[in-house]
């Protein structure tokens, strides 16, 4: 490793150089080293010899370059320049300079510097640097202006080319000049900050000093010695009495020798009695003394034994629970005791409260004498010994967090100090992998605990945040996640309780709550109020008084002062044990935390199996060209072996998977939870097969349920013959049908070549006997658990199909995240090999391997391969094909230059202004190895022109199908004079049974009428658009007429201008529809007459016979549902029944859409020969449309199912492709315009309809109204039926009635429009008693308004009639207009005979009469003259509804609309028609 120091214009920087990497130095902030005002860019790199160069100039120790403001000095240090020296052991000051008397002599220095106060560095953490004003001193690369400065441990000092690093025990030095010193040299190796094991820490074997537990028993003293209570005189008196009696007898009767014998014997008895007494007394005293001496010696030994046990206990406690000061030494020296405790140890989560008289770890057994009348001092001695050792004095008092919630009460600042001690103890001896802390505390107390943020245990790794909750934000951010974690752990315990297995949760969470107010309204409170020890969570509560504590607290600790505490209860038992807390005033807590923060705890030593290996590394190549794919394809033969590399067991130890039927295959299972590398191992296997075997020998069919990324990854791989995604209902059955079709195809080919196994066929293919390639087909499902859950029948059939197809070269590989409950007996028994990566739990591992091993896997890509019944069982690391492919070999040099700030929550917060990573001039996008290999295979395939294998699985129908992709759409090429039979191209059909997709074409003669049933919004209108344009493009407008009934949302309106369209109808155009119904009925009758006349059965035969053009009539109805409850429902349905029954032979065809089948009446529905179902919300409705179907209709716009023997699925075509530059309507308009311009022949007539307003002047010239008047008629308006001119013949009597005088006045205005012409032809006489004609009084021959004048007019009319009877018709006819006929009769008393004569003879003689009146008055009058006139007149205009008039008896009209202004009925010959008067 090299270090480079760069100095320029008072700026100093240091760079750790890594071999093979390049660096830049410039004034740009994005450079590796930024120097202000540098003025140039310096590139640092190594040449081929490994020498570092700056802009191609070698750096030999020192390189000086000219800069804009100052020289640029680059100073290069190597391992040889490094040294490390201890501080002097006696003095507190040392010098570094050029002089011989300096403690460290460096000749290159101009002036000396002084380093002092290093003897107290352990406490102060710094030394002082003193220098003169002529010496530039940099501390941490900042130039110091003061002459005396502090340098803390870890600080870097630079003085005149010398680099120093302050350490607690000495100085590290980098100098290119010799360093001479008498100081102790500490090490000769330069520290490598980037070494792989830098600051890594492995647990050492733990030394446990057990507390003595063997019982010590103090035996009771032996029974007291029994004292002889015989009194000496009892031995002396009897012989003395005998001597006395003997003397008395001798005195009475001297006997001689007998007396001597008796006296002698008595004397001897006396002597022996006395000696025996004193002898026994002496022996008793000795026995008593010995008993006492022996027992006291026994007690002394027991005392020593007890004392030894107590010392052993005290030592054990002091060893395992050292003081905080001792902990600091342990941490500082990186002692092996760090992180020594694990969750399996007996003292896990134990910590010291303080010093107290603690209970012995062993039992002292002594049985005190219950009762004795005599006091035995030895019993007192034994009791005294027993009572002396009741406790272990001044030993650590231990508490633990394993047995329920604990609580601290007392002053908060004292409790916080105790919690700090607990933090230090637990953090030092428990790894952050096993233990985490969460503090819920007041915001003002966070500063006190700020030092603890350095502890790795304070980071909640599951939430990636520090374990401090002190405000609303941190509460919501952390506690909600903790709540979920607790909930999951509780659920896990409940599930595991059924199997009686104990769960140890890691990490253990110590949940400290000093402020309950922060969680009082949070959902986590329900868990805080219970004991969570079982779930790996220890609760600690802090309150001022015991009354504030929750009821479930088991252990209570009262901190009374800094020197006194009391353990009140422990595990719910009252103990009241006082202790002395430890004083930690002189301990730097943050120093301990920082030292622990530097340690990276590695739990397990590295295995011989690599943690990861890339795909190309497994093949021991760097470039894809080196794979020699073509040669592998040429040499490898599947009928011999199918072994391909999958991973490594160790270095250079390749593990291969061979799915040859006689090896590991043909079928298998892959299991692995999320992030285990399950998909990657499948990808690597697919890639490995593709590299080793030709596309004609191996092919893949991927089942990617619900869609995913694997299908996209291999889309360009030639071996991929299909991907099955989104297997919903019918897609699952479609896939199964395709696979079964492939099996049938293979069986057919086997039969043709008289073989029964894929290997035999492959050999024939290699020999050229068989010509059609038939590769091994690998059906791979990346996630079959959900597929099996939602499509169980499909999975069952798939496994069964694979079992049948093993000899046909079918291989099934099923992968799942959670095999438990998914891998049934059928799947497991048919899967010869199993690949198990990391699974969620032991049950999953047992499910697939029948062992729990896979549950212990931690690395992604690590897997077990099991073949058969443990015939092969190996652990290996699978290859990773997603690695970056970089043939230049600099893929490891990509460096993230994002600068992060660690915020108050312990999270990384990017502070770069530009986070894009695109600051380089050129951004290089690297391929993955998988992409590179696929591209390489694709290029080989193209170069060798390899023929693609026929695909057994066609992709699902696209969601957009266009008519131009299915059939010719240029009408200019398609229109011809000869009428063609109609063929409708509906869309793209899918026939998986035949492995075919192509145009869905219907021959109209066979298809008949078409009914499409589908839910709204799924393409019903598009279906009609497609048919409209298909017909229009293939047939001229004179060959095909279309009537569009748009009962939906005006979807057919855009196509109304197509020249083939006769007319367009909406549901509210009742009159127009009624008129169309009559026209259709007339056309049916007309065409039937033609068939009858020419004795043919169809219009097609008529065309062939006569050569005449009778157009096809297409009736297209969108949303037939709207017919129901419409005013025209009955007549429309009756017409449609007739049309669907008779129209097909007449070349009149109906195509309709509806949302349900019962929208049509049964007779009509039966006549709809072709029924099509689109997606329907009511699934059962599909069966009503197409009958029993194999495939459901997908919930895709445009997808449909045709009723036929096989119920063909297809996707509706669209008449136009999507065009970014034009809207759909613009495309329609363009083609319509082109058709209109191209075609100059006849187009169909539309349905004539009454305009909203008809003005006399608008029609005067076009209809030649003056000529009509000149020919003896009054044009009055248009009829609604044919929109033809309606007129009143003046040569016949007529009667006009209306409801009100205003209408009469309007009628008068229209009648008199051509008054001049009338005057030329007629002598006009008007009898106008009501005044509606008075505007014309001066424009006519005679006008009568008053009663007498009316009589005169009447008399004139009678005389005129008589004169004409005598003389015959005059040169000029007369026209009499009688307005208000009722009043006229009242005035003139005209007889009935005169009325008859005027009506019958008048017109013959040129006397024309016109009656006008109010309808009600005419009806209510009882004048016979009116009745006579009504019966004899055959021209009527009635201005009220037919149902309301009483002139004639017509059938009642249901729901007849109200007569609008200017509307009337013309009645003639007992028939009526509705008209509208001119305006």
Swiss-Prot record:
> What's the superkingdom here?
Bacteria
Q: Is Repeat there in the keyword field?
A: yes
Where are the Cytoplasmic topological domains?
1-229, 280-1479
Q: Which UniProt keywords apply?
A: ATP-binding, Cell membrane, Membrane, Nucleotide-binding, Repeat, Transmembrane, Transmembrane helix, Virulence
Membrane-spanning residues where?
230-252, 257-279
Where are the Extracellular topological domains?
253-256
The record's section on PROSITE patterns has: FTSK
Cysteine pairs bridged by disulfides in the record: none
Q: Which NCBIfam families match?
A: T7_EssCb_Firm
Show the domain comment. The N-terminal region is composed of two iterations of forkhead-associated (FHA) domain-like structures, which could interact with other proteins in the Esx secretion system.
Q: State the oligomer form and interacting partners.
A: Homooligomer. Interacts with EsaE.
Supply the name of the protein.
Type VII secretion system protein EssC
- The protein's organism comes out as Staphylococcus aureus (strain Mu50 / ATCC 700699)
Q: Which gene encodes it?
A: essC
């Amino acid at each position: 490793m090299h270090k480079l120091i760069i100095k320029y214009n008072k700026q100093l920087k240091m760079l750790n150089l890594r071999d093979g990497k390049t660096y830049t130095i410039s004034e740009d902030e994005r450079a590796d080293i930024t120097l202000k005002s540098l003025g140039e860019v310096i590139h640092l790199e190594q040449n081929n010899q490994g020498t570092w160069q700056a802009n191609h100039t070698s750096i030999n120790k020192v390189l000086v370059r000219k800069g804009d403001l100052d020289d640029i000095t680059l100073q290069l240090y190597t391992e040889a320049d490094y040294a490390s020296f201890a501080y002097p052991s006696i003095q507190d000051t040392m010098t570094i300079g050029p002089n011989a008397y300096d403690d460290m002599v460096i000749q290159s220095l101009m002036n000396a510097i002084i380093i002092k106060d290093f003897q107290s560095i352990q406490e102060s953490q710094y030394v002082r640097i003193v220098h003169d004003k002529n010496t530039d001193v940099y501390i941490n690369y900042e130039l110091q202006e003061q002459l005396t400065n502090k340098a803390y441990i870890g600080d870097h000092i630079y003085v005149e080319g010398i680099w120093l690093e302050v350490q607690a025990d000495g100085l590290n030095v980098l100098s290119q000049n010799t360093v001479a010193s008498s100081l102790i040299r500490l090490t000769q190796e330069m520290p490598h900050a980037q070494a792989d094991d830098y600051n890594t820490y492995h647990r050492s074997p733990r030394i446990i000093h057990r507390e003595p537990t063997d019982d010590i028993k103090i035996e009771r003293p032996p029974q007291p010695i029994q004292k002889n209570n015989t009194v000496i005189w009892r031995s002396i008196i009897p012989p003395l009495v005998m001597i006395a009696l003997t003397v008395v007898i001798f005195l009475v009767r001297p006997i001689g020798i007998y007396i001597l014998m008796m006296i002698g014997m008595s004397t001897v008895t006396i002597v022996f009695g006395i000696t025996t007494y004193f002898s026994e007394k002496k022996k008793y005293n000795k026995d008593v003394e010995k008993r006492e001496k022996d027992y006291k010696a026994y007690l002394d030994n027991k005392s020593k034994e007890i004392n030894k046990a107590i010392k052993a206990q005290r030592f054990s406690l002091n060893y395992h629970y050292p003081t905080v000061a001792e902990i600091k030494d342990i941490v500082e020296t990186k002692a092996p005791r760090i992180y020594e405790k694990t969750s399996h140890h007996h003292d896990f989560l134990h910590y010291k409260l303080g010093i107290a008289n603690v209970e012995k770890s062993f039992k002292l057994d002594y049985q005190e004498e219950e009762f004795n009348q005599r006091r035995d001092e030895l019993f007192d001695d034994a009791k005294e010994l027993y009572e002396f050792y009741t406790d272990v004095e001044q030993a650590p008092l231990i508490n633990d967090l394993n047995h329920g919630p604990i609580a601290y009460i007392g002053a908060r600042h004292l409790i916080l100090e105790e919690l700090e001690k607990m933090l230090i103890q637990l953090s030092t001896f428990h790894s952050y992998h096993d233990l985490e802390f969460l503090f819920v505390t007041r915001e003002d107390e966070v500063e006190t605990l700020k030092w603890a943020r350095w502890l790795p245990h304070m980071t909640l790794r599951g939430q990636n945040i520090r374990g401090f909750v002190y405000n609303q934000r941190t509460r919501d951010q952390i506690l909600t996640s903790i709540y979920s974690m607790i909930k999951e752990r509780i659920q896990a315990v409940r599930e595991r309780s059924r199997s009686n297995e104990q769960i140890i949760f890691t990490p253990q969470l110590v949940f400290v709550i000093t402020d309950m107010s922060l969680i009082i309204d949070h959902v986590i409170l329900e868990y805080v109020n219970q004991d969570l020890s079982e779930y790996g969570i220890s609760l600690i509560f802090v309150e001022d008084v015991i009354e504030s504590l929750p009821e479930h607290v088991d252990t209570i600790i009262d901190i009374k002062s800094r020197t006194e505490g009391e353990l009140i209860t422990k595990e719910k038992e009252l103990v009241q044990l006082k202790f002395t807390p430890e004083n930690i005033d002189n301990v730097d807590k943050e120093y301990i935390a920082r030292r622990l923060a530097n340690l990276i705890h590695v739990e397990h030593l590295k295995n011989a199996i690599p943690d990861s290996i890339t795909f190309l590394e497994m093949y021991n190549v760097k470039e894809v060209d080196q794979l020699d794919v073509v040669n592998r394809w040429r040499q490898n033969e599947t009928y011999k072996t199918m072994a391909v590399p999958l991973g490594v067991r160790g270095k250079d130890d390749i593990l291969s998977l061979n799915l040859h039927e006689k090896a590991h295959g043909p079928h298998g299972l892959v299991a692995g939870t999320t992030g285990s590398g399950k998909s990657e191992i499948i990808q690597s296997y697919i890639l490995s097969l593709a590299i080793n075997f030709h596309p004609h020998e191996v092919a893949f069919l991927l089942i990617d349920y619900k869609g995913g990324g694997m299908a996209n990854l291999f889309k360009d791989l030639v071996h991929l013959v299909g991907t099955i995604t989104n297997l919903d209902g019918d897609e699952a059955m479609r896939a199964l049908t395709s696979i079964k079709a492939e099996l049938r195809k293979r069986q057919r080919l086997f039969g043709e070549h008289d073989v029964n196994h894929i290997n035999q066929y492959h050999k024939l293919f290699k020999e050229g006997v068989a010509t059609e390639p038939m590769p091994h087909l690998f059906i791979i499902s990346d996630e079959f658990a959900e597929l099996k859950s939602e499509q169980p029948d499909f999975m069952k059939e798939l496994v069964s199909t694979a079992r049948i197809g093993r000899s046909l070269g079918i291989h099934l590989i099923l992968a799942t995240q959670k095999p438990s409950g998914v891998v049934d007996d059928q799947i497991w028994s048919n899967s010869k090999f199993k690949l198990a990566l990391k699974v969620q739990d032991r049950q999953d591992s047992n499910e697939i391997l029948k062992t729990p091993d896979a549950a212990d896997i931690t690395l992604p890509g690590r897997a077990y391969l099991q073949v058969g019944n443990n015939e092969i069982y190996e652990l290996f690391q699978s290859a990773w094909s997603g690695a970056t492919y970089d043939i230049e070999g600099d893929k490891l040099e990509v460096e993230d230059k994002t600068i992060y700030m660690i915020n108050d929550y312990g999270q990384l917060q990017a502070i770069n202004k530009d986070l894009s990573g695109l600051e380089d001039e050129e951004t290089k996008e690297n391929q993955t190895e998988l992409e590179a290999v696929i591209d390489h295979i694709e290029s080989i395939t193209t170069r060798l022109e390899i023929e693609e294998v026929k695909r057994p699985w066609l992709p699902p129908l696209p969601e957009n199908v266009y008519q131009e992709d299915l059939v010719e759409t240029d009408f200019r090429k398609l229109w011809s004079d000869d009428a063609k039979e109609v063929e409708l191209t509906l869309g793209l059909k899918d026939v998986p049974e035949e492995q075919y997709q192509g145009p869905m074409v219907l021959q109209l003669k066979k298809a008949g009428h078409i009914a499409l049933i589908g839910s709204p919004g799924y393409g019903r209108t598009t279906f009609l658009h497609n048919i409209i344009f298909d017909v229009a493009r293939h047939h001229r407008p004179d060959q095909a007429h279309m009537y569009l009934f748009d009962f939906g949302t005006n979807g057919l309106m855009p196509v109304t201008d197509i020249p083939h369209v006769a007319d367009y109808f909406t549901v509210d155009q009742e009159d127009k529809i009624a008129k169309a119904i009559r026209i259709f009925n007339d056309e049916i009758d007309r065409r039937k007459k033609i068939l009858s006349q020419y004795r043919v059965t169809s219009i097609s035969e008529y065309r062939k016979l006569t050569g005449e053009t009778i157009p096809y009539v297409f009736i297209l109805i969108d949303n037939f549902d709207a017919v129901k409850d419409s005013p025209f429902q009955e007549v429309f349905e009756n017409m449609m029944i007739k049309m669907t029954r008779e129209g097909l032979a007449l070349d009149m065809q109906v195509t309709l859409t509806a949302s349900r089948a019962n929208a049509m009446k049964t007779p009509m529905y039966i006549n709809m020969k072709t029924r099509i179902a689109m997606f329907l919300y009511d699934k059962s409705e599909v069966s009503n449309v197409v009958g029993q179907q194999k495939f459901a209709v997908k919930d895709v716009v445009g997808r449909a199912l045709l009723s036929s023997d096989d119920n063909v699925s297809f996707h509706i075509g669209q008449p136009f492709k999507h065009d970014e530059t034009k809207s759909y309507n613009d495309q329609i308009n363009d083609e319509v315009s082109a058709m209109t311009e191209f075609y100059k022949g006849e187009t169909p007539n539309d349905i004539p309809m009454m305009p909203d307003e008809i003005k006399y002047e608008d029609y005067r010239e076009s209809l030649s109204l003056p000529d009509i008047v000149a020919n003896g008629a009054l044009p009055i308006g248009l009829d609604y039926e044919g929109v033809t001119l309606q007129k009143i013949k003046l040569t016949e009597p007529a009667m006009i009635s209306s409801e009100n005088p205003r209408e009469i006045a309007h009628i008068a205005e229209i009648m008199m429009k051509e008054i001049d012409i009338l005057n030329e032809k007629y002598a006009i006489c008007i009898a106008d008693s009501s005044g509606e004609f008075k505007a014309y009084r001066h424009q006519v021959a005679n006008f009568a308004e008053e009663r007498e004048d009316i009589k005169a007019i009447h008399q004139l009319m009678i005389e005129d009639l008589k004169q004409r009877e005598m003389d015959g018709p005059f040169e000029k006819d007369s026209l009499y207009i009688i307005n208000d006929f009722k009043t006229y009769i009242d005035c003139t008393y005209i007889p009935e005979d005169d009325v008859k004569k005027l009506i019958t003879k008048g017109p013959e003689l040129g006397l024309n009469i016109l009656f006008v009146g109010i309808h009600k008055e005419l009806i209510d009058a009882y004048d016979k003259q009116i009745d006579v006139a009504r019966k004899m007149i055959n021209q009527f205009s009635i201005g009220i509804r037919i149902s309301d008039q009483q002139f004639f008896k017509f059938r009642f009209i249901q729901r007849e609309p109200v007569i609008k202004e200017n509307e009337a009925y013309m009645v003639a010959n007992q028939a009526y028609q509705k008209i509208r008067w001119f305006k």
